[in-house]
Amino acid sequence: MAQADIALIGLAVMGQNLILNMNDHGFVVCAFNRTVSKVDDFLAKEAKGTKVIGAKSLKDMVSKLKKPRRVILLVKAGQAVDDFIEKLVPLLDTGDIIIDGGNSEYRDTTRRCQDLKAKGILFVGSGVSGGEEGARYGPSLMPGGNKEAWPHIKTIFQAIAAKVGTGEPCCDWVGDEGAGHFVKMVHNGIEYGDMQLICEAYHLMKDVLGMRHEEMAQAFEDWNKTELDSFLIEITANILKFQDTDGKELLPKIRDSAGQKGTGKWTAISALEYGMPVTLIGEAVFARCLSSLKEERVQASRKLKGPKMVQLEGSKQAFLEDVRKALYASKIISYAQGFMLLRQAATEFGWTLNYGGIALMWRGGCIIRSVFLGKIKDAFERNPELQNLLLDDFFKSAVDDCQDSWRRVISTGVQAGIPMPCFTTALSFYDGYRHEMLPANLIQAQRDYFGAHTYELLSKPGEFIHTNWTGHGGSVSSSSYNA
């Protein structure tokens, strides 16, 4: 008998928690897992006493669903998603809906959308952020794909999503085809950037200011009452305070080799592909790569010398405030770059993205949730066509206010030999973006000199000129070499 509102395939912790969240909101969910014993275990333990029902096979699961049938896949990205889709299609009817809630690559989502549309099935690729806790009590949801599916899943999605402000759900329709998963990918890239910026602030506190763990924890707690109020700042304070069973701080005992699952790398690759200078996320990915060279760094630390110890000028408290402002300014740059990539992707794929809506989706329930995102939403509400966050009056004045501190921190850190890849690239981007003239004219001349690639004159844009530079710039002649 058809009694379930929706089915979910994949009973790892995220899947189980999403089912329990839907159950809490009055929806009847049918649970299925490839290992059927997991379904029985779930119904006997975590889902005991709920309205959740189980299925012994995909056919059994489909028979228990109300029409149009809605099926969420929460399985490993890649081949597993395609395998389940292949098995589901013969069991479904025209107008039924398959939702991929995993971390799928956005191009895969676009391909699946197109393939399934031809078969009459509505496909949705939805970013799900917030981890296990978010899945259970309110994630950030970023659905995209075949928009015909949205009226049939909107009630469920917005009911279970995190709420902010006056109860606004952190979920809305993102856009066509792979838009939802693209937005989730950029979210994850920004997460990499936020985490690395916090690490650089921590490094400066520890090695320039010589702060103890409890002092650093207090600083992050204080910062969490400012514009930096966010989940990542909050947990950083908790991590710094956390003591091991021996009563000593746990953090210094953790091996300094950061792992990654690849979503930050995807963002950096997309930025290169679409010609967007998303430098901060790129540097955050490379910082993790460098951290993973632990054995090499141990050897290098014994052979490569850094600068002599630099005496900090001014008070420690003043420098700590400078670090806070440098972190805030760099964070603004990171989000500005992330939204530049979203805008470029929208142009590439013909998506209509609601940038303020995306900021709201990230405002709660996800790892990068912060008060700051409300300011981004406001900026796009003031001007939906805003080209860059830095051109919004609020963010322009915020960076103006932080600029002197930002430059002091980077100067001091460089002199002290502290690696700050994200602080420094953020400032370099800001300085590059605000320069009317950059030295790229020399690059164009060099390219024309050795490769006859032509250049434009400032006075004649759109007209491409080649110069025979021999005799004016040296004895090298032009060739067809590409660079």
Curated annotation (Swiss-Prot):
Q: What is its EC number?
A: 1.1.1.44
Keywords from UniProt, A to Z, are: Acetylation, Cytoplasm, Gluconate utilization, NADP, Oxidoreductase, Pentose shunt, Phosphoprotein
Q: Which residues carry this modification: N6-acetyllysine?
A: K38, K59
Pathway(s) this gene product operates in, as recorded in its UniProt entry: Carbohydrate degradation; pentose phosphate pathway; D-ribulose 5-phosphate from D-glucose 6-phosphate (oxidative stage): step 3/3
- Record's Gene Ontology CC terms? cytosol
Q: Which residues form the active site?
A: K184, E191
Q: Where does substrate bind?
A: N103, S129, G130, G131, H187, N188, Y192, K261, R288, R447, H453
Q: What domain of life does the UniProt record list for this protein's source?
A: Eukaryota
Residue positions of the PTM Phosphoserine?
S57, S129
Question: SMART domains annotated for this entry?
Answer: 6PGD (SM01350)
**One MF term in GO for this entry?**
carbohydrate binding
Main location, first listed in the record = cytoplasm
What is the annotated localization of this protein? Cytoplasm
InterPro entries for this protein = 6-PGluconate_DH-like_C_sf, 6PGD_dom2, 6PGDH_C, 6PGDH_Gnd/GntZ, 6PGDH_NADP-bd, 6PGdom_BS, NAD(P)-bd_dom_sf, Pgluconate_DH
Catalytic activity from the UniProt record: 6-phospho-D-gluconate + NADP(+) = D-ribulose 5-phosphate + CO2 + NADPH
Q: Name one GO biological process term.
A: pentose biosynthetic process
Q: Which parts of the sequence bind NADP(+)? A: 10-15, 33-35, 75-77, 103, 478-481
Describe its function: Catalyzes the oxidative decarboxylation of 6-phosphogluconate to ribulose 5-phosphate and CO(2), with concomitant reduction of NADP to NADPH.
**According to its UniProt record, which protein family does this protein belong to?**
Belongs to the 6-phosphogluconate dehydrogenase family.
Entry-linked PANTHER family: 6-PHOSPHOGLUCONATE DEHYDROGENASE
Q: Could you give the subunit structure recorded for this chain?
A: Homodimer.
Protein name from the UniProt record: 6-phosphogluconate dehydrogenase, decarboxylating
Organism this protein belongs to: Rattus norvegicus
Q: What is the lineage of its organism?
A: Eukaryota, Metazoa, Chordata, Craniata, Vertebrata
